[in-house]
Amino acid sequence: MKLCIVGGTRFLGKHIVLQAQDAEHEITLVHRGKTNPDLFPDVEAIHLDRNANLDALAGRQWDAVIDTCGYYPRQVRDLLAVIKSSIGLYVFISSVSVYADFAVAGITEEYPVGTLDDEITEEMSGATYGPLKALCEQAALDALPHNSLIIRPGLIVGPNDPTDRFTYWPVVFDQARQIIFPHCPTSTIQY
C-alpha cells in the first residue's frame, strides 16, 4: 500500500511510520523537517510547512493519507484541495475532545460536538482545541464524504510522549507514602 503520513517524526506519527514499515508499506512522510528530520532515512520525505505552499503534493498518488497534525480546519481544507483527487482514503487523527460535554456516560459518535462562535479562529487553547478538531473533521467530510476516516482517540500515551502526562503519575505513585482518591466501583474512570 502506498501511504502518505502527514507529520510522523514526533510521537504518534513516529509509531504509525514504524508500524507501516513493519507491514512493508511504501511510505511518503510529509513534515516540516524540524523535529527529528533524519529519523527515517530510508523513507521518502517531503519537507514542507502545511501552513504554506502544498504544491509539492500535487499529482502524487497514495492509497491512503494519514494526517496526524491537523489542528485548524483551514489546514485540512488546504491539504485536501491539493490531494483529494489522487488518494483512496484520508485518515484524520482527531480527539475525543471534540465532544461538547463529558458529563454523560455512553457517548457515541453521534453525540454533539463542541462549537465555536468564531469558526475561523486559530487561537489554540483548552477551550478551542476540541471544537477546532471537530471543525477539521467536518472539513474532511465535506471534501471527501465517502473516503474519510475520522479517528477520535482518547489520551494517547507511550514511548516518546513529549507531554509526560502519563509517566508523571507512576513516578508520583512510586514516590508517595500514601495516596488518597475517591472510590467508585461503578465508574469507568477515576479523576
Tell what function each PLM region has:
Residues 9, 34-87, 92, 98-101:
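NAD(P)H-binding glycine-rich loop region in Rossmannoid oxidoreductase-like domains
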Residues 129-133:
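Active-site YXXXK catalytic motif of short-chain dehydrogenase/reductase
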Residues 154-163, 183-191:
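Glycine-rich "substrate-gating" loop/helix at the edge of Rossmann-like oxidoreductase active sites
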Residues 96-127, 142:
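Active-site "gating" loop of Rossmann-like NAD(P)-dependent oxidoreductase/epimerase domains
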Residues 3-25:
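N-terminal Rossmann NAD(P)H-binding glycine-rich loop of SDR-like oxidoreductase domains
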Residues 136-159:
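Conserved beta-loop-beta element that borders a ligand/cofactor-binding pocket
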Residues 26-32:
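Conserved glycine-rich Rossmann-like NAD(P)H-binding loop of the short-chain dehydrogenase/reductase
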